[in-house]
């Protein structure tokens, strides 16, 4: 059963200034400790702004799809395995995530569905 669909579109340039912050306060609020550790290893501002934009967009899409749960962004951990983004919020909910990139924008989509085999 589909629980919700969320979509978010962001301009990467909105995250360029945030990626240059020396105190990283935005990144620390948005990312989990594991995500932040990965972010901190990035050297180029373009990589950092893209990382923040993808994570913001995915977390926004997830929030919109499961807004009845009211998850905090800092509790949503985005992982990437085999070129697929993943996030686990509840064993009974499967999140299907998709990200599309262009030179200026990132679009994220989340389809949240109840997993019938885990009721």
Swiss-Prot record:
InterPro entries: 4-PPantetheinyl_Trfase_dom, 4-PPantetheinyl_Trfase_dom_sf, ACPS, Ppantetheine-prot_Trfase_dom. GO terms for molecular function: holo-[acyl-carrier-protein] synthase activity; magnesium ion binding. It holds the Pfam family ACPS. Its EC number is 2.7.8.7. The keyword Metal-binding applies. It is an enzyme of class 2 (transferase). One of its GO terms (biological process) is fatty acid biosynthetic process. It is found in: Cytoplasm. Mg(2+) binds at residues 8, 60. Its main location: cytoplasm. GO terms for cellular component: cytoplasm. Coiled coil: none annotated. Its cofactor is Mg(2+). It catalyses: apo-[ACP] + CoA = holo-[ACP] + adenosine 3',5'-bisphosphate + H(+). The keyword Lipid metabolism applies. Keywords: Cytoplasm, Fatty acid biosynthesis, Fatty acid metabolism, Lipid biosynthesis, Lipid metabolism, Magnesium, Metal-binding, Transferase. Belongs to the P-Pant transferase superfamily. AcpS family. Transfers the 4'-phosphopantetheine moiety from coenzyme A to a Ser of acyl-carrier-protein. This is Holo-[acyl-carrier-protein] synthase. The lineage of its organism: Bacteria, Bacillati, Mycoplasmatota, Mycoplasmoidales, Mycoplasmoidaceae. The gene is acpS.
């Amino acid at each position: 059963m589909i629980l919700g669909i969320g979509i978010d579109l962001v301009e990467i340039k909105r995250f360029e200034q945030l990626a240059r912050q020396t105190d990283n306060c935005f990144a620390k609020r948005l990312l989990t400790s594991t995500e932040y550790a990965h972010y901190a290893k990035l050297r180029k501002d373009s990589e950092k702004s893209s990382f923040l934009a993808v994570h913001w967009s995915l977390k926004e899409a997830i929030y919109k799809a499961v807004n009845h749960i009211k998850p905090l962004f800092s509790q949503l951990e985005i992982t990437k395995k085999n070129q697929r983004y993943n996030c686990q919020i509840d064993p009974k909910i499967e999140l299907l995530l998709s990200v599309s990139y262009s030179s200026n924008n990132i679009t994220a989509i989340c389809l949240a569905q109840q997993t019938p085999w885990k009721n």
